[in-house]
Regions:
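Extracellular/periplasmic carbohydrate-active domains that bind, remodel
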Residues: 1-231
C-alpha cells in the first residue's frame, strides 16, 4: 500500500519542515506491516526521519527531499554504553543524521527523485589559494550526515540521486545484505568529508552501476571506532 506524504500533511514549498508529516507516513506504513511512502514531485524540507521495518521511501520524478541544516531539526547520533567511551564523542560523530534506521529489516529508498543535503550552503570558497580554486573549501555551518543506517538487514538504495551532502552521504554501520544500485551521488568536489558510500562493519554489500562524485572518499570500506565496538 502507498502512503503519500501530502495526505499526512507535507507541504511542497521547500520551507516548511515536513519531518512530522513524513514520519507519520512511515509510521502508518510500518504499523500496517509495510508499504511505500511516496514523496511526489515538489520540494520538501525536512528534519530527521527514521525509516522502519518493511518500509520503502519512494521519491517520484521531480521530488526533492531537502535536509534541514537546523540542529534542532536533526536527530543526534545514538551513543553506545554509558557515554564514557571516548569514541562516542570523537570528531566526525557530532553532527547527527537526516535519514536513517536502526535495528530494522527490509528497508528501501528508491525512485527517480533527489535527496538534497544543502552542502552548497555549508562549503565556502574564501579564495585561500589565490584564485586557483582547488583547495578544500571552508566548512562554516552545522553538518549532518545525509544518511545513517545502523544494524539494518536487507537494505536497498536504488535509482535515486543524492546531491550536495554536507558530510558523509550514505553511511551504513553493522548492516547485512545491502544492495546499492543505479544511484548518483553528486557532491562538491572540493567539499570536506563528503564521502559517497561508507560501508562500516557491514556484511554482504553489493554496489553496482553507480556514479559517485565527491571531494573525499567515493566508496570506502571501513571499521570506525564506535561501530567496531558494536559489530
Amino acid at each position: 500500500m502507498d502512503y503519500s506524504i501530502l495526505r499526512c500533511g507535507a507541504v511542497a514549498d521547500g520551507v516548511t519542515n515536513c519531518a512530522a508529516a513524513i514520519q507519520r507516513a512511515v509510521d502508518a506504513a510500518a504499523a500496517a506491516g509495510g508499504g511505500r511512502v511516496i514523496v511526489p514531485a515538489g520540494r520538501f524540507l525536512s528534519g530527521s526521519v527514521l525509516l522502519k521495518d518493511n518500509v520503502e521511501l519512494h521519491l517520484e520524478s521531480g521530488a526533492v527531499l531537502i535536509s534541514s541544516l537546523n540542529p534542532a531539526d536533526i536527530t543526534p547520533f545514538p551513543q553506545g554504553g554509558d557515554g564514557t567511551d571516548p569514541d562516542d564523542t570523537a570528531d566526525g560523530w557530532e553532527g547527527g543524521f537526516f535519514l536513517g534506521a536502526s535495528h530494522a529489516k527490509n528497508v528501501t529508498i528508491s525512485g527517480m527523485g533527489t535527496i538534497y543535503g544543502q552542502g552548497d550552503k555549508v562549503f565556502l570558497d574564501k579564495n585561500v589559494d589565490n584564485g586557483f580554486h582547488e583547495c578544500p573549501k571552508f566548512c562554516e555551518a552545522f553538518r549532518p550526515r545525509m544518511m545513517l543506517f545502523e544494524a539494518v538487514e536487507n537494505f536497498t538504495v536504488r535509482d535515486v540521486t543524492l546531491q550536495d551532502a554536507a558530510f558523509w552521504t550514505l553511511h551504513m554501520a553493522g548492516c547485512r545484505h545491502v544492495r546499492i544500485q543505479n544511484i548518483m551521488i553528486l557532491n562538491d568536489d572540493r567539499g570536506a568529508n563528503n564521502d559517497g558510500i561508507d560501508p562500516d562493519c557491514c556484511q554482504d554489500v553489493v554496489i553496482s552501476n553507480c556514479i559517485v562524485r565527491t571531494g573525499d572518499d567515493a566508496i570506502v570500506v571501513k571499521s570506525t571506532g564506535p561501530m567496531s565496538r558494536r559489530y
